């Protein structure tokens, strides 16, 4: 049976139609529809604010009422600025949108990311991180069982033994980078270091991931795949907002012209590289040696323990982003922060030049125990984490306890790197670059070091952590041994004031470089 409001609405429409004024009728229908939408929106906001299961969590009024402010921030690439401000204002537990909570403490890392026997895993949000265009999983987007399989297959490449195998390759490209910088040193002009670091790291990951360089340093220009990666990630952010609104099919029509086809371009580079790699026989000393043994070059031997061809493709794309952009960002951040703090730069340079008499002495192994250099990297990752836009996890069926409170199933939850590391209740003088805090913990006894997890925790933590640390230490050590570096403040501005779409949209970093006396 129809309700009284339905009958009244129908009667009103019939009355309008009987007047014969079609234009007035259309306007009236539009007005009624608009009023209904407005009423629905107001009712939804009231529910979200006062009756939703997450209503007790603090957060900014408009963000608790509607997901619209969140979507706008995501599209603008300014979410990290909001998280930093909100967590400082509202504390370590924050309601970021009606169905999402953001945390800024150590306990949340354990409750959300750590393995708990008998409890289902908090999987990554499938709306924020959908499957690749071919519909196949990767180490980044997979269920628990398949993630373990991918992790096992790539585990050898990122082990200590694998790192020793890759040492010669990484050293070779670090030395090539020193030669490239020599061309622009002492010319009286500033050098844009983002491009140079990208070239060095991208060539290195090319050799490690596919057995061949991208030849960026040889050609003295950025490979187009780097641009495709950034455009793809920006288009993914737009697609996510459209997907959350149920109108993802409209995405191609909404995307700016320069972003259309970005995802396809990104995967086309991966397809070409992985196909070329699979044609090579014998061990190449790269990430794929064990995968191919288990799977065959075309995935034809995959019995459930290897990978299909589609999985190889998706993982290749993930490895390039994870192994290049993140390390390049850390190198840029460390160089900028050191140049901003001459006393810290002096300490880092003193440690490096005091230990090594020649560049040949600087190897992956010899830089392992560089105390101050490692502290510089750790403090850089606190102030400028390589993956600032970490996707949230989804609370499993039945709900779970996070930070001592029950959280309903399907709620999005996550730990904000930026929100955590800049919160004054977690780190003393949190906006200052102080590498010493990672050497002498008594310097700031109230600092919450357990909340500092730039590589994440649990079974899905960064598989390339050891490789990244080794590469960062090596390239920074060689660069600071060979060159005196000062910041061109006028051309650079505030380098850390950047937007993010999953990774940093890095602004230009201008440095003046001169060959050090010990390198002449």
Curated annotation (Swiss-Prot):
InterPro entries assigned: Cyt_P450 (IPR001128), Cyt_P450_CS (IPR017972), Cyt_P450_E_grp-I (IPR002401), Cyt_P450_sf (IPR036396), Cytochrome_P450_monoxygenase (IPR050121)
Enzyme nomenclature, EC number: 1.14.19.n5
Keyword Lipid metabolism among record annotations: no
Record protein name field: Versicolorin B desaturase
Organism lineage: Eukaryota, Fungi, Dikarya, Ascomycota, Pezizomycotina
Membrane topology term: Single-pass membrane protein
UniProt keyword annotation of NAD present: no
Cofactor: heme
Keywords: Glycoprotein, Heme, Iron, Membrane, Metal-binding, Monooxygenase, NADP, Oxidoreductase, Transmembrane, Transmembrane helix
PANTHER family in UniProt: CYTOCHROME P450 (PTHR24305), CYTOCHROME P450 MONOOXYGENASE ASQL-RELATED (PTHR24305:SF210)
Chief site of localization: membrane
Subcellular location: Membrane
GO cellular component assignments: membrane
């Amino acid at each position: 049976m129809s309700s009284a409001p339905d009958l009244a609405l129908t009667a009103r429409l019939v009355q309008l139609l009987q007047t014969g004024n079609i234009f007035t009728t259309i306007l009236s229908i539009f007005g009624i529809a608009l009023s209904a939408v407005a009423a629905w929106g107001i009712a939804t906001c009231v529910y979200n604010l006062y009756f939703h299961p997450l209503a007790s969590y603090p957060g900014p009024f408009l963000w608790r009422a509607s997901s619209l402010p969140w979507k706008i921030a995501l599209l603008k690439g300014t979410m990290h600025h909001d998280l930093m401000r909100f967590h400082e204002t509202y504390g370590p537990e924050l309601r970021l949108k009606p169905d999402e909570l953001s945390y800024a403490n150590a306990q949340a890392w354990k409750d959300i990311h750590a393995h708990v026997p008998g409890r289902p895993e908090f999987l990554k949000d499938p709306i924020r991180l959908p499957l690749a265009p071919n519909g196949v999983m990767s180490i980044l987007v997979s269920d628990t069982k398949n993630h373990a399989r991918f992790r096992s297959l790539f585990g050898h490449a990122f082990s200590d033994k694998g790192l020793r195998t890759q040492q010669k390759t990484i050293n070779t490209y670090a030395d090539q980078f020193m030669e490239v910088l020599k061309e622009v040193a002492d010319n009286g002009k500033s050098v844009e270091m983002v491009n140079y670091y990208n070239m060095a790291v991208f060539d290195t990951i090319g050799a490690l991931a596919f057995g061949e360089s991208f030849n960026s340093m040889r050609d003295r220009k950025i490979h187009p795949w780097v641009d495709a990666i950034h455009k793809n990630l920006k288009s993914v952010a737009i697609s996510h907002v459209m997907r959350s609104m149920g109108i993802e099919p409209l995405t191609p029509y909404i995307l700016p012209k320069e972003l259309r086809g970005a995802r396809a371009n990104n995967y086309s580079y991966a397809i070409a590289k992985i196909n070329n790699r699979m044609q090579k026989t014998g061990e190449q000393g790269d990430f794929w040696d064990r995968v191919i043994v288990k799977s065959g070059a075309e995935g034809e031997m995959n019995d459930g323990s290897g990978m299909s061809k589609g999985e190889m493709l998706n993982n290749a794309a993930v490895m390039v982003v994870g192994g290049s952009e993140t390390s390049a960002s850390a190198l840029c951040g460390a160089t900028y922060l050191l140049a901003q703090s001459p006393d810290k730069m002096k300490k880092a340079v003193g440690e490096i030049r005091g230990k090594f008499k020649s560049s040949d002495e600087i190897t992956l192994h010899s830089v392992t125990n560089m105390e101050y250099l490692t502290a510089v990297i750790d403090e850089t990752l606190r102030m400028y984490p390589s993956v600032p836009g970490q996707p949230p996890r989804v609370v499993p069926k039945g709900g779970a306890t996070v930070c001592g409170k029950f959280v309903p199933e399907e709620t999005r939850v996550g730990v904000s790197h930026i929100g955590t590391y800049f919160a004054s209740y977690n780190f003393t003088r949190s906006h200052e670059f102080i590498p010493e805090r990672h050497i002498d913990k008594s310097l700031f006894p109230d600092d919450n070091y357990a909340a500092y997890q730039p590589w994440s925790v649990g079974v899905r933590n960064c598989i390339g952590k050891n490789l990244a640390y080794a590469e960062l230490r090596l390239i920074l050590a060689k660069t600071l041994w060979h060159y005196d570096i000062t910041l061109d403040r006028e051309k650079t501005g505030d380098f850390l004031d950047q937007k993010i779409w999953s990774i940093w949209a890095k602004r230009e970093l201008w440095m003046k470089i001169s060959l050090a006396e010990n390198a002449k």
